[in-house]
């Protein structure tokens, strides 16, 4: 069968790489893909942008694609799933209506409140003065979020009132996030440890994926501005069996049932960003309507199940007939980014020292890369690569991931040197 993966990031390289391992699959196309997918013998890039729905649809029809897997959020919130389904094609992802869970933070907070799903106390604002009055009433630390899609960067955790007021001005008056910031959500600062809880949903049934923990801040020790994610590991020890059960009962099931009851039946990957307090109670920080990036990379390295088989079952509403199998070992991925990220950075730099052959129990996934005409690999984004490895402990996986990147360099490249530190601290104590 033929599979199409939509996207060009590290997440899509990992999903396509995993899909190509399925015995059901003959060909995997990636639209538009990157240098990493271009260099994989089992994958084929197609030069179509992720939001060009008419072109994606006609390609899928002409090539008789049997299954499409959507990586990023942008095509989901503009209805790629609706368009493919209307044409009778199998596609795994949420409809435009269901993708509002990521597309609008205000929609999500109101939905959580309606269904009594645990989350931070909040209010939505479109005007500066009421927002500032609310800030002064609540005090800092406090969190300000742009309502729409801002590539994971539209969230300011303000530790002082001045910082909070500046963020409100930037978003509502200064247009810091364009259309995404015309409405903002101000919510209480939650203390605890974050985890990424990702499941597959077929509208009715849920199949949990392995847990993971992302590292959002650009600097070591979780300092500096938020990014799309500087590294991740799986499993996340903070999600104990008890926390897992609470998350399913209090958050995932009520969300799936609530969406169906409101006429937005949810299908696809559902990613709950959780904050887990000292008592092990999870609250929703955010929902994403797709797999996380960089969490996908370490999770796919651990996945023993056939991803394509699971996606097909989900498209047919038969996820209850499936289980997911995972490598017992931990995995960890470190993002190598372009100098200046998450601010402005240069592109078109040649990347040196990429591994020439596949390594056992490890993989360098490509994100912001492109292949030059002479087959040199060049940078084309802020997050460029993700070096990912398995290990019997998170510490061992960390050591192997950093070893994979020893020779990789380009002008200005950088990474955090402490990915996985929370889990490693736990292992040592």
From Swiss-Prot:
InterPro entries: ATP-grasp, ATP_grasp_subdomain_1, PreATP-grasp_dom_sf, PRibGlycinamid_synth_ATP-grasp, PRibGlycinamide_synth, PRibGlycinamide_synth_C-dom, PRibGlycinamide_synth_C_sf, PRibGlycinamide_synth_CS. GO terms for molecular function: ATP binding; metal ion binding; phosphoribosylamine-glycine ligase activity. Its cofactor is Mg(2+); Mn(2+). Mg(2+) binds at residues 286, 288. Transmembrane segments: none annotated. Belongs to the GARS family. Monomer. This is Phosphoribosylamine--glycine ligase. The lineage of its organism: Bacteria, Pseudomonadati, Pseudomonadota, Gammaproteobacteria, Enterobacterales.
